[in-house]
Amino acid sequence: MYTLLSGLYKYMFQKDEYCILILGLDNAGKTTFLEQSKTRFNKNYKGMSLSKITTTVGLNIGTVDVGKARLMFWDLGGQEELQSLWDKYYAECHGVIYVIDSTDEERLAESKQAFEKVVTSEALCGVPVLVLANKQDVETCLSIPDIKTAFSDCTSKIGRRDCLTQACSALTGKGVREGIEWMVKCVVRNVHRPPRQRDIT
């Protein structure tokens, strides 16, 4: 009887889990975005001081609950030598958030090259991609049209998948909630990558 009730409880209350990769060059604001996401969606999470965030070497993990979905974020280091590790996580993921530093015009071509490798990977075929033009709170930042123009060569390589380019300021939190909610809709309806299985035994 206990097993039946335990299974029913899990079925009723356990959330479907989706793994989301947060990718982009170093200093794009990936970890700040992750912290803002946790602060906005987790009521009891106080968050770390954004000024204390340093360059990620390896992996940061965070979890956010949105409705009946649980998003498990994997924030991967963006330095060139760490980008070769990104594809180790592709098979497990349900969505990609690609963060661009829209104040760093000098590295835009480098960011585009890294993005191209992501969207052309067969392991990510059909996986939704949210492109965040971060640091939009800075007056001298590139606009969304500027970034879309710079990345226009990638349009044909995105393939048949949900893809959105959105303005964001991870520092102020602007655009964070909207981006996460868009991603949730996409991963939930993507039948090609079902959520992690519930354990209802």
Swiss-Prot record:
InterPro entries for this protein: P-loop_NTPase (IPR027417), Small_GTP-bd (IPR005225), Small_GTPase_ARF (IPR024156), Small_GTPase_ARF/SAR (IPR006689)
Keywords: Acetylation, Golgi apparatus, GTP-binding, Nucleotide-binding
Gene Ontology, cellular component aspect: cytosol; Golgi apparatus; membrane; trans-Golgi network; trans-Golgi network membrane
A Pfam family per the record: Arf
Residues that bind GTP: 24-31, 75-79, 134-137
Main location, first listed in the record: Golgi
Residues recorded with modification N-acetylmethionine: 1
GO MF: GTP binding; GTPase activity
Gene3D superfamilies membership: P-loop containing nucleotide triphosphate hydrolases
Keyword Mitochondrion carried by entry: no
Tissue expression notes: Found in most tissues.
CDD domains: Arfrp1
Subcellular location: Golgi apparatus; Golgi apparatus, trans-Golgi network
Any single biological process term in GO: retrograde transport, endosome to Golgi
Assembly: Interacts with SYS1.
PANTHER family given in the database record: ADP-RIBOSYLATION FACTOR-RELATED PROTEIN 1 (PTHR45909:SF1)
Family, similarity comment: Belongs to the small GTPase superfamily. Arf family.
Function: Trans-Golgi-associated GTPase that regulates protein sorting. Controls the targeting of ARL1 and its effector to the trans-Golgi. Required for the lipidation of chylomicrons in the intestine and required for VLDL lipidation in the liver.
Name used for this protein in its record: ADP-ribosylation factor-related protein 1
Organism: Homo sapiens
